[in-house]
Protein backbone atom coordinates (compact mmCIF):
# COMPACT_ATOMS: atom_id res chain seq x y z
CA UNK A 1 0.00 0.00 0.00
CA UNK A 2 1.55 3.30 -1.09
CA UNK A 3 1.97 6.35 1.13
CA UNK A 4 -0.63 8.14 -1.00
CA UNK A 5 -3.24 5.47 -0.25
CA UNK A 6 -2.46 5.58 3.48
CA UNK A 7 -2.85 9.37 3.58
CA UNK A 8 -6.07 9.08 1.59
CA UNK A 9 -7.66 7.19 4.52
CA UNK A 10 -6.90 10.15 6.80
CA UNK A 11 -8.14 12.65 4.23
CA UNK A 12 -11.42 10.75 3.90
CA UNK A 13 -11.79 10.64 7.67
CA UNK A 14 -11.17 14.40 7.87
CA UNK A 15 -13.68 15.05 5.07
CA UNK A 16 -16.25 12.89 6.86
CA UNK A 17 -15.72 14.78 10.15
CA UNK A 18 -15.95 18.11 8.36
CA UNK A 19 -19.09 17.07 6.53
CA UNK A 20 -20.63 15.72 9.76
CA UNK A 21 -20.13 18.91 11.82
CA UNK A 22 -21.26 21.13 8.95
CA UNK A 23 -24.43 19.08 8.46
CA UNK A 24 -25.20 19.02 12.20
CA UNK A 25 -24.65 22.79 12.46
CA UNK A 26 -26.97 23.26 9.48
CA UNK A 27 -29.63 20.85 10.84
CA UNK A 28 -29.51 22.59 14.23
CA UNK A 29 -30.82 25.82 12.67
CA UNK A 30 -34.28 24.22 12.23
CA UNK A 31 -36.43 23.54 15.32
CA UNK A 32 -38.08 20.44 13.85
CA UNK A 33 -34.70 18.63 13.75
CA UNK A 34 -33.65 19.24 17.34
CA UNK A 35 -35.38 16.30 19.00
CA UNK A 36 -34.09 13.82 16.39
CA UNK A 37 -30.53 15.13 16.79
CA UNK A 38 -30.82 14.88 20.57
CA UNK A 39 -32.16 11.31 20.45
CA UNK A 40 -29.36 10.33 18.06
CA UNK A 41 -26.81 11.29 20.75
CA UNK A 42 -25.41 14.30 18.93
CA UNK A 43 -23.92 15.89 22.08
CA UNK A 44 -21.51 13.07 22.84
CA UNK A 45 -20.43 12.97 19.18
CA UNK A 46 -19.72 16.71 19.03
CA UNK A 47 -17.72 16.83 22.25
CA UNK A 48 -14.49 15.18 20.95
CA UNK A 49 -14.69 17.34 17.82
CA UNK A 50 -14.18 20.45 19.99
CA UNK A 51 -10.59 19.24 20.42
CA UNK A 52 -10.14 18.20 16.79
CA UNK A 53 -6.77 18.82 15.15
CA UNK A 54 -8.48 20.77 12.37
CA UNK A 55 -9.45 24.31 13.52
CA UNK A 56 -12.51 24.61 11.22
CA UNK A 57 -13.93 21.37 12.63
CA UNK A 58 -13.44 22.71 16.19
CA UNK A 59 -15.22 25.97 15.33
CA UNK A 60 -18.12 24.31 13.52
CA UNK A 61 -18.55 21.80 16.36
CA UNK A 62 -18.75 24.71 18.83
CA UNK A 63 -21.24 26.51 16.57
CA UNK A 64 -23.43 23.38 16.37
CA UNK A 65 -23.29 22.97 20.16
CA UNK A 66 -24.27 26.60 20.65
CA UNK A 67 -27.25 26.27 18.31
CA UNK A 68 -28.42 23.15 20.13
CA UNK A 69 -27.93 24.62 23.62
CA UNK A 70 -29.79 27.73 22.50
CA UNK A 71 -33.03 25.78 21.95
CA UNK A 72 -33.92 24.56 25.39
CA UNK A 73 -32.54 24.06 28.87
CA UNK A 74 -32.37 20.26 28.45
CA UNK A 75 -29.75 20.61 25.74
CA UNK A 76 -27.97 23.36 27.67
CA UNK A 77 -27.98 21.03 30.68
CA UNK A 78 -26.44 18.32 28.49
CA UNK A 79 -23.53 20.66 27.66
CA UNK A 80 -22.91 21.19 31.39
CA UNK A 81 -23.27 17.50 32.27
CA UNK A 82 -21.13 16.43 29.33
CA UNK A 83 -18.23 18.33 30.90
CA UNK A 84 -17.92 20.46 27.79
CA UNK A 85 -17.64 23.85 29.54
CA UNK A 86 -14.05 23.48 30.86
CA UNK A 87 -12.95 22.53 27.33
CA UNK A 88 -14.60 25.63 25.89
CA UNK A 89 -13.09 27.92 28.53
CA UNK A 90 -9.62 26.50 27.93
CA UNK A 91 -9.96 26.95 24.17
CA UNK A 92 -11.41 30.45 24.59
CA UNK A 93 -8.07 31.59 25.96
CA UNK A 94 -5.88 29.70 23.49
CA UNK A 95 -7.56 29.65 20.09
CA UNK A 96 -8.09 31.99 17.14
CA UNK A 97 -10.84 34.60 16.81
CA UNK A 98 -13.25 32.33 14.93
CA UNK A 99 -13.15 29.74 17.68
CA UNK A 100 -13.43 32.40 20.40
CA UNK A 101 -16.64 33.70 18.85
CA UNK A 102 -18.12 30.21 18.60
CA UNK A 103 -17.09 29.28 22.17
CA UNK A 104 -18.54 32.52 23.59
CA UNK A 105 -21.74 31.76 21.68
CA UNK A 106 -22.01 28.36 23.41
CA UNK A 107 -21.49 29.98 26.83
CA UNK A 108 -24.19 32.53 26.06
CA UNK A 109 -26.57 29.83 24.76
CA UNK A 110 -26.11 27.77 27.94
CA UNK A 111 -26.21 30.71 30.36
CA UNK A 112 -29.36 32.34 29.03
CA UNK A 113 -31.81 29.67 30.24
CA UNK A 114 -31.62 29.87 34.03
CA UNK A 115 -29.58 31.20 36.97
CA UNK A 116 -28.42 27.62 37.68
CA UNK A 117 -26.98 27.17 34.18
CA UNK A 118 -25.40 30.63 34.29
CA UNK A 119 -23.87 29.71 37.66
CA UNK A 120 -22.36 26.59 36.06
CA UNK A 121 -20.55 28.88 33.61
CA UNK A 122 -19.27 31.05 36.45
CA UNK A 123 -18.14 27.96 38.38
CA UNK A 124 -15.99 26.72 35.52
CA UNK A 125 -14.02 29.99 35.50
CA UNK A 126 -15.46 31.40 32.27
CA UNK A 127 -15.88 35.00 33.46
CA UNK A 128 -12.19 35.87 33.63
CA UNK A 129 -11.65 34.45 30.15
CA UNK A 130 -14.68 36.28 28.74
CA UNK A 131 -13.44 39.55 30.26
CA UNK A 132 -10.04 39.01 28.60
CA UNK A 133 -11.96 38.59 25.31
CA UNK A 134 -13.42 42.09 25.83
CA UNK A 135 -9.89 43.36 25.15
CA UNK A 136 -9.47 41.30 21.99
CA UNK A 137 -8.41 43.09 18.84
CA UNK A 138 -11.35 41.65 16.89
CA UNK A 139 -14.69 43.48 17.43
CA UNK A 140 -16.62 40.24 16.77
CA UNK A 141 -14.86 38.53 19.69
CA UNK A 142 -15.57 41.52 21.97
CA UNK A 143 -19.22 41.42 20.91
CA UNK A 144 -19.57 37.67 21.55
CA UNK A 145 -17.96 38.02 25.00
CA UNK A 146 -20.08 41.06 25.97
CA UNK A 147 -23.20 39.21 24.87
CA UNK A 148 -22.37 36.17 27.01
CA UNK A 149 -21.55 38.37 30.04
CA UNK A 150 -24.85 40.26 29.66
CA UNK A 151 -26.84 37.03 29.50
CA UNK A 152 -25.17 35.77 32.67
CA UNK A 153 -25.64 39.08 34.52
CA UNK A 154 -29.33 39.50 33.67
CA UNK A 155 -30.51 36.64 35.94
CA UNK A 156 -29.88 38.02 39.42
CA UNK A 157 -27.79 40.25 41.69
CA UNK A 158 -25.26 37.54 42.61
CA UNK A 159 -24.44 36.65 38.99
CA UNK A 160 -24.30 40.33 38.08
CA UNK A 161 -21.90 40.94 40.96
CA UNK A 162 -19.72 38.07 39.73
CA UNK A 163 -19.50 39.76 36.30
CA UNK A 164 -18.58 43.06 37.98
CA UNK A 165 -15.97 41.36 40.19
CA UNK A 166 -14.36 39.86 37.10
CA UNK A 167 -13.65 43.45 35.95
CA UNK A 168 -16.13 43.63 33.06
CA UNK A 169 -17.58 47.12 33.55
CA UNK A 170 -14.68 49.42 32.54
CA UNK A 171 -14.15 47.28 29.43
CA UNK A 172 -17.86 47.33 28.53
CA UNK A 173 -17.76 51.14 28.84
CA UNK A 174 -14.83 51.13 26.39
CA UNK A 175 -16.84 48.86 24.07
CA UNK A 176 -19.71 51.38 23.83
CA UNK A 177 -17.15 53.87 22.52
CA UNK A 178 -15.97 51.58 19.70
CA UNK A 179 -17.06 52.45 16.14
CA UNK A 180 -18.91 49.16 15.43
CA UNK A 181 -22.67 49.58 15.96
CA UNK A 182 -23.26 45.90 16.78
CA UNK A 183 -20.62 46.02 19.53
CA UNK A 184 -22.07 49.26 20.95
CA UNK A 185 -25.54 47.64 21.08
CA UNK A 186 -24.43 44.52 22.91
CA UNK A 187 -22.20 46.41 25.37
CA UNK A 188 -25.03 48.87 26.19
CA UNK A 189 -27.38 45.91 26.65
CA UNK A 190 -24.90 44.23 29.03
CA UNK A 191 -24.57 47.45 31.09
CA UNK A 192 -28.38 47.56 31.27
CA UNK A 193 -28.50 43.92 32.45
CA UNK A 194 -25.94 44.65 35.19
CA UNK A 195 -27.52 47.93 36.35
CA UNK A 196 -31.05 46.66 36.77
CA UNK A 197 -30.60 44.56 39.91
CA UNK A 198 -29.55 47.01 42.63
CA UNK A 199 -28.50 50.62 43.33
CA UNK A 200 -24.98 49.36 44.16
CA UNK A 201 -24.53 47.64 40.79
CA UNK A 202 -25.94 50.67 38.97
CA UNK A 203 -23.53 52.88 40.91
CA UNK A 204 -20.61 50.72 39.73
CA UNK A 205 -21.69 51.34 36.13
CA UNK A 206 -22.00 55.08 36.82
CA UNK A 207 -18.57 55.21 38.50
CA UNK A 208 -17.03 53.80 35.32
CA UNK A 209 -18.29 56.88 33.45
CA UNK A 210 -21.03 55.10 31.50
CA UNK A 211 -23.75 57.77 31.69
CA UNK A 212 -22.02 60.41 29.55
CA UNK A 213 -21.20 57.92 26.79
CA UNK A 214 -24.71 56.44 26.82
CA UNK A 215 -26.33 59.91 26.75
CA UNK A 216 -24.30 60.85 23.66
CA UNK A 217 -25.88 57.95 21.75
CA UNK A 218 -29.53 58.94 22.35
CA UNK A 219 -29.64 60.53 18.91
CA UNK A 220 -27.79 57.75 17.09
CA UNK A 221 -29.67 56.86 13.89
CA UNK A 222 -29.55 53.12 14.68
CA UNK A 223 -32.88 52.17 16.32
CA UNK A 224 -31.63 48.99 17.99
CA UNK A 225 -28.75 50.89 19.60
CA UNK A 226 -31.15 53.60 20.83
CA UNK A 227 -33.34 50.91 22.42
CA UNK A 228 -30.41 49.56 24.44
CA UNK A 229 -29.07 53.00 25.39
CA UNK A 230 -32.46 54.16 26.69
CA UNK A 231 -32.91 50.86 28.51
CA UNK A 232 -29.52 51.17 30.23
CA UNK A 233 -30.22 54.76 31.34
CA UNK A 234 -33.65 53.65 32.67
CA UNK A 235 -32.11 50.80 34.65
CA UNK A 236 -29.66 53.26 36.25
CA UNK A 237 -32.23 56.02 36.93
CA UNK A 238 -34.88 53.79 38.49
CA UNK A 239 -33.01 53.00 41.73
CA UNK A 240 -32.72 56.33 43.55
CA UNK A 241 -33.05 60.11 43.38
CA UNK A 242 -29.26 60.49 43.21
CA UNK A 243 -28.88 58.13 40.27
CA UNK A 244 -31.85 59.72 38.45
CA UNK A 245 -30.31 63.17 38.96
CA UNK A 246 -27.00 61.94 37.53
CA UNK A 247 -28.81 60.76 34.40
CA UNK A 248 -30.61 64.13 34.11
CA UNK A 249 -27.32 66.00 34.58
CA UNK A 250 -26.01 64.30 31.43
CA UNK A 251 -28.38 66.71 29.62
CA UNK A 252 -30.73 64.07 28.25
CA UNK A 253 -33.55 66.66 28.12
CA UNK A 254 -34.92 67.77 25.73
CA UNK A 255 -33.03 65.41 23.34
CA UNK A 256 -34.68 62.28 24.71
CA UNK A 257 -38.10 63.69 23.73
CA UNK A 258 -37.22 63.26 20.04
CA UNK A 259 -37.16 59.49 20.69
CA UNK A 260 -40.88 59.67 21.54
CA UNK A 261 -41.53 60.40 17.84
CA UNK A 262 -39.24 57.62 16.60
CA UNK A 263 -40.46 55.20 13.92
CA UNK A 264 -39.34 52.27 16.08
CA UNK A 265 -42.01 51.31 18.64
CA UNK A 266 -39.47 50.02 21.17
CA UNK A 267 -37.44 53.22 21.04
CA UNK A 268 -40.67 55.03 21.97
CA UNK A 269 -41.43 52.57 24.75
CA UNK A 270 -37.93 52.73 26.23
CA UNK A 271 -37.87 56.54 26.05
CA UNK A 272 -41.18 56.66 27.96
CA UNK A 273 -39.76 54.19 30.47
CA UNK A 274 -36.70 56.38 31.03
CA UNK A 275 -38.86 59.48 31.58
CA UNK A 276 -41.12 57.50 33.93
CA UNK A 277 -38.17 56.23 36.00
CA UNK A 278 -36.97 59.82 36.47
CA UNK A 279 -40.41 61.34 37.12
CA UNK A 280 -41.41 58.87 39.82
CA UNK A 281 -38.76 59.96 42.34
CA UNK A 282 -39.56 63.57 43.30
CA UNK A 283 -41.84 66.52 42.41
CA UNK A 284 -38.70 68.47 41.40
CA UNK A 285 -37.65 65.88 38.82
CA UNK A 286 -41.24 65.73 37.53
CA UNK A 287 -41.32 69.53 37.27
CA UNK A 288 -38.11 69.46 35.26
CA UNK A 289 -39.78 67.06 32.80
CA UNK A 290 -42.87 69.30 32.60
CA UNK A 291 -40.67 72.35 31.92
CA UNK A 292 -38.87 70.50 29.12
CA UNK A 293 -42.21 69.73 27.44
CA UNK A 294 -42.01 66.09 28.47
CA UNK A 295 -45.62 65.64 29.60
CA UNK A 296 -47.14 66.89 26.33
CA UNK A 297 -44.64 64.78 24.36
CA UNK A 298 -45.52 61.62 26.31
CA UNK A 299 -49.27 62.25 25.81
CA UNK A 300 -48.71 62.57 22.03
CA UNK A 301 -46.64 59.39 22.13
CA UNK A 302 -49.43 57.46 23.93
CA UNK A 303 -51.81 58.65 21.20
CA UNK A 304 -49.55 57.38 18.43
CA UNK A 305 -49.13 53.80 19.65
CA UNK A 306 -51.08 50.84 21.02
CA UNK A 307 -50.87 48.05 23.59
CA UNK A 308 -47.86 47.52 25.83
CA UNK A 309 -45.92 50.31 24.09
CA UNK A 310 -48.34 52.73 25.81
CA UNK A 311 -47.87 51.34 29.31
CA UNK A 312 -44.75 53.25 30.52
CA UNK A 313 -46.21 56.55 29.26
CA UNK A 314 -49.52 55.93 31.07
CA UNK A 315 -47.64 55.17 34.29
CA UNK A 316 -45.41 58.20 33.87
CA UNK A 317 -48.48 60.50 33.73
CA UNK A 318 -49.78 58.85 36.91
CA UNK A 319 -46.49 59.36 38.73
CA UNK A 320 -46.29 63.03 37.72
CA UNK A 321 -49.92 63.62 38.77
CA UNK A 322 -49.42 61.88 42.11
CA UNK A 323 -46.73 64.32 43.28
CA UNK A 324 -48.80 67.51 43.61
CA UNK A 325 -51.92 69.32 42.44
CA UNK A 326 -49.86 71.68 40.25
CA UNK A 327 -48.17 68.78 38.48
CA UNK A 328 -51.53 67.01 38.07
CA UNK A 329 -52.90 70.22 36.57
CA UNK A 330 -49.96 70.31 34.12
CA UNK A 331 -51.05 66.85 32.89
CA UNK A 332 -54.70 68.02 32.64
CA UNK A 333 -53.76 71.19 30.71
CA UNK A 334 -51.70 69.09 28.28
CA UNK A 335 -54.89 67.08 27.48
CA UNK A 336 -53.79 64.00 29.40
CA UNK A 337 -57.28 63.04 30.61
CA UNK A 338 -58.91 62.40 27.18
CA UNK A 339 -55.89 60.33 26.14
CA UNK A 340 -56.00 58.20 29.31
CA UNK A 341 -59.77 57.79 28.87
CA UNK A 342 -59.17 56.44 25.35
CA UNK A 343 -56.68 53.92 26.77
CA UNK A 344 -59.22 52.91 29.41
CA UNK A 345 -61.93 52.25 26.80
CA UNK A 346 -59.86 51.00 23.86
CA UNK A 347 -57.16 48.76 25.26
CA UNK A 348 -58.12 45.07 25.30
CA UNK A 349 -55.66 44.06 28.02
CA UNK A 350 -56.64 44.44 31.67
CA UNK A 351 -53.20 45.43 32.96
CA UNK A 352 -53.11 48.45 30.61
CA UNK A 353 -56.67 49.45 31.56
CA UNK A 354 -55.63 49.12 35.23
CA UNK A 355 -52.67 51.48 34.72
CA UNK A 356 -54.94 54.03 32.99
CA UNK A 357 -57.49 53.76 35.83
CA UNK A 358 -54.74 54.31 38.40
CA UNK A 359 -53.38 57.35 36.51
CA UNK A 360 -56.86 58.90 36.19
CA UNK A 361 -57.36 58.38 39.93
CA UNK A 362 -54.09 60.22 40.62
CA UNK A 363 -55.21 63.11 38.40
CA UNK A 364 -58.66 63.49 39.95
CA UNK A 365 -57.86 63.14 43.63
CA UNK A 366 -56.45 66.61 44.39
CA UNK A 367 -59.23 69.24 44.23
CA UNK A 368 -62.80 69.64 42.87
CA UNK A 369 -61.28 71.28 39.78
CA UNK A 370 -59.10 68.21 39.13
CA UNK A 371 -62.00 65.83 39.76
CA UNK A 372 -64.25 67.78 37.37
CA UNK A 373 -61.58 67.65 34.63
CA UNK A 374 -61.69 63.86 34.86
CA UNK A 375 -65.47 63.59 35.36
CA UNK A 376 -66.46 65.65 32.28
CA UNK A 377 -64.76 63.12 29.97
CA UNK A 378 -67.37 60.52 30.98
CA UNK A 379 -64.65 58.41 32.54
CA UNK A 380 -66.51 57.58 35.75
CA UNK A 381 -69.16 55.30 34.16
CA UNK A 382 -66.39 53.41 32.32
CA UNK A 383 -64.49 52.94 35.59
CA UNK A 384 -67.69 51.76 37.28
CA UNK A 385 -68.45 49.19 34.57
CA UNK A 386 -64.85 47.87 34.78
CA UNK A 387 -65.18 47.61 38.56
CA UNK A 388 -68.53 45.79 38.29
CA UNK A 389 -67.58 43.50 35.39
CA UNK A 390 -66.95 39.86 36.39
CA UNK A 391 -64.59 39.64 33.40
CA UNK A 392 -62.21 42.26 34.82
CA UNK A 393 -59.07 41.00 36.56
CA UNK A 394 -58.82 41.44 40.32
CA UNK A 395 -56.18 44.14 39.88
CA UNK A 396 -58.33 46.06 37.38
CA UNK A 397 -61.35 45.91 39.72
CA UNK A 398 -59.24 47.14 42.62
CA UNK A 399 -57.61 49.98 40.65
CA UNK A 400 -60.98 51.06 39.17
CA UNK A 401 -62.63 51.11 42.61
CA UNK A 402 -59.76 53.13 44.09
CA UNK A 403 -59.85 55.59 41.17
CA UNK A 404 -63.64 56.05 41.49
CA UNK A 405 -63.30 56.75 45.22
CA UNK A 406 -60.37 59.14 44.67
CA UNK A 407 -62.32 61.14 42.08
CA UNK A 408 -65.72 61.02 43.83
CA UNK A 409 -64.34 62.28 47.13
CA UNK A 410 -63.33 65.54 45.42
CA UNK A 411 -66.02 65.75 42.74
CA UNK A 412 -68.60 68.53 43.07
CA UNK A 413 -69.71 68.37 39.42
CA UNK A 414 -73.22 67.01 39.99
CA UNK A 415 -74.18 65.98 36.41
CA UNK A 416 -71.34 63.44 36.55
CA UNK A 417 -72.40 62.18 39.97
CA UNK A 418 -76.11 61.74 39.33
CA UNK A 419 -75.99 58.55 37.19
CA UNK A 420 -74.14 56.91 40.08
CA UNK A 421 -77.24 57.24 42.28
CA UNK A 422 -78.88 54.63 40.05
CA UNK A 423 -75.98 52.35 39.06
CA UNK A 424 -73.45 52.30 41.89
CA UNK A 425 -73.12 49.47 44.41
CA UNK A 426 -73.56 50.41 48.13
CA UNK A 427 -69.82 50.86 48.84
CA UNK A 428 -69.56 53.47 46.04
CA UNK A 429 -73.03 54.95 46.58
CA UNK A 430 -71.97 56.12 50.03
CA UNK A 431 -69.34 58.45 48.49
CA UNK A 432 -71.79 59.75 45.84
CA UNK A 433 -74.47 60.66 48.41
CA UNK A 434 -71.71 62.18 50.55
CA UNK A 435 -70.74 64.56 47.73
CA UNK A 436 -74.38 65.64 47.18
CA UNK A 437 -74.68 66.31 50.92
CA UNK A 438 -71.68 68.67 50.65
CA UNK A 439 -72.81 70.58 47.55
CA UNK A 440 -76.62 70.93 47.87
CA UNK A 441 -76.70 73.08 51.07
CA UNK A 442 -74.76 75.83 49.25
CA UNK A 443 -76.30 75.76 45.74
CA UNK A 444 -80.01 76.59 45.22
CA UNK A 445 -79.91 75.91 41.48
CA UNK A 446 -78.45 72.46 42.13
CA UNK A 447 -81.14 71.80 44.78
CA UNK A 448 -83.92 72.53 42.27
CA UNK A 449 -82.27 70.41 39.57
CA UNK A 450 -81.84 67.56 42.04
CA UNK A 451 -85.62 67.47 42.53
CA UNK A 452 -86.61 67.74 38.85
CA UNK A 453 -84.07 65.14 37.70
CA UNK A 454 -85.42 62.57 40.14
CA UNK A 455 -82.33 62.60 42.36
CA UNK A 456 -84.18 63.44 45.56
CA UNK A 457 -86.73 60.68 44.92
CA UNK A 458 -83.87 58.20 44.37
CA UNK A 459 -82.20 59.22 47.65
CA UNK A 460 -85.44 58.48 49.55
CA UNK A 461 -85.38 54.93 48.12
CA UNK A 462 -81.90 54.18 49.48
CA UNK A 463 -82.01 51.82 52.43
CA UNK A 464 -79.41 52.96 54.96
CA UNK A 465 -78.57 51.53 58.37
CA UNK A 466 -79.80 53.87 61.15
CA UNK A 467 -76.85 55.82 62.56
CA UNK A 468 -74.58 54.96 59.60
CA UNK A 469 -72.54 57.54 57.67
CA UNK A 470 -74.80 57.00 54.66
CA UNK A 471 -77.88 57.81 56.78
CA UNK A 472 -76.15 60.99 57.99
CA UNK A 473 -75.52 62.04 54.37
CA UNK A 474 -79.19 61.36 53.46
CA UNK A 475 -80.35 63.43 56.45
CA UNK A 476 -78.07 66.32 55.34
CA UNK A 477 -79.66 66.22 51.87
CA UNK A 478 -83.21 66.02 53.26
CA UNK A 479 -82.49 69.01 55.51
CA UNK A 480 -82.00 71.10 52.35
CA UNK A 481 -85.71 70.74 51.46
CA UNK A 482 -89.08 71.48 53.10
CA UNK A 483 -90.43 68.49 55.00
CA UNK A 484 -93.51 68.05 52.77
CA UNK A 485 -91.28 67.84 49.64
CA UNK A 486 -89.20 65.07 51.22
CA UNK A 487 -92.39 63.27 52.26
CA UNK A 488 -93.81 63.69 48.76
CA UNK A 489 -90.82 61.88 47.22
CA UNK A 490 -90.60 59.16 49.87
CA UNK A 491 -91.64 55.62 48.83
CA UNK A 492 -95.23 54.82 49.78
CA UNK A 493 -96.29 58.48 49.89
CA UNK A 494 -99.04 57.97 47.27
CA UNK A 495 -100.42 55.06 49.34
CA UNK A 496 -100.51 57.33 52.39
CA UNK A 497 -102.41 59.94 50.37
CA UNK A 498 -104.88 57.32 49.16
CA UNK A 499 -105.40 56.14 52.75
CA UNK A 500 -106.15 59.72 53.71
CA UNK A 501 -108.64 59.93 50.84
CA UNK A 502 -110.28 56.69 52.01
CA UNK A 503 -110.50 57.82 55.62
CA UNK A 504 -111.60 61.37 54.78
CA UNK A 505 -115.14 62.16 55.77
CA UNK A 506 -116.67 65.00 53.72
CA UNK A 507 -118.49 67.63 55.74
From Swiss-Prot:
The keyword Cytoplasm applies. Highly expressed in testis. Not detected in prostate, ovary, spleen, thymus, small intestine, colon and peripheral blood leukocytes. It is found in: Cytoplasm, Cytoskeleton; Cell projection, Cilium, Flagellum; Cytoplasm, Cytoskeleton, Cilium axoneme. Disruption phenotype: In null embryos the central apparatus is unstable leading to a loss, and presumably degradation of proteins to which SPAG6 normally binds, including SPAG16 and SPAG17. GO terms for biological process: cell division; cerebrospinal fluid circulation; ear development; epithelial cilium movement involved in extracellular fluid movement; establishment of epithelial cell apical/basal polarity; establishment of localization in cell; fibroblast migration; filopodium assembly. Keywords: Cell projection, Cilium, Cilium biogenesis/degradation, Cytoplasm, Cytoskeleton, Flagellum, Microtubule, Repeat. One of its GO terms (cellular component) is lateral wall of outer hair cell. Pfam families: Arm. ARM repeats lie at residues 31-70, 73-112, 115-154, 157-196, 199-238, 241-280, 325-365, 402-441. SMART domains: ARM. The keyword Cytoplasm applies. GO terms for molecular function: microtubule binding. Interacts with SPAG16 and SPAG17. It is linked to Defects in Spag6 are a cause of hydrocephalus and of male infertility. Important for structural integrity of the central apparatus in the sperm tail and for flagellar motility. This is Sperm-associated antigen 6. The lineage of its organism: Eukaryota, Metazoa, Chordata, Craniata, Vertebrata.
Amino acid sequence: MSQRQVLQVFEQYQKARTQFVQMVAELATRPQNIETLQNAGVMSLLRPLLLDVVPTIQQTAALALGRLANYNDDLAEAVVKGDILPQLVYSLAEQNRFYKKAAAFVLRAVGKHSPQLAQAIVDCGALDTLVICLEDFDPGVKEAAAWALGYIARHNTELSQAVVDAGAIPLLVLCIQEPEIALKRIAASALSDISKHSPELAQTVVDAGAIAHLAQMILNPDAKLKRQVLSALSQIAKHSVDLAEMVVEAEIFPVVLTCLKDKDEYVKKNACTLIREIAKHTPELSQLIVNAGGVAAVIDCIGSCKGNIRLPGIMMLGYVAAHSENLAMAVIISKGVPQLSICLSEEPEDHIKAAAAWALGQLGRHTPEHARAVAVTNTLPVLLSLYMSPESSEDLQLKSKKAIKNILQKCTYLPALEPFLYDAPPNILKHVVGQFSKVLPHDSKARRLFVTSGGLKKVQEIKAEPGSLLQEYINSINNCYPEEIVRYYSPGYSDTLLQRVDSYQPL
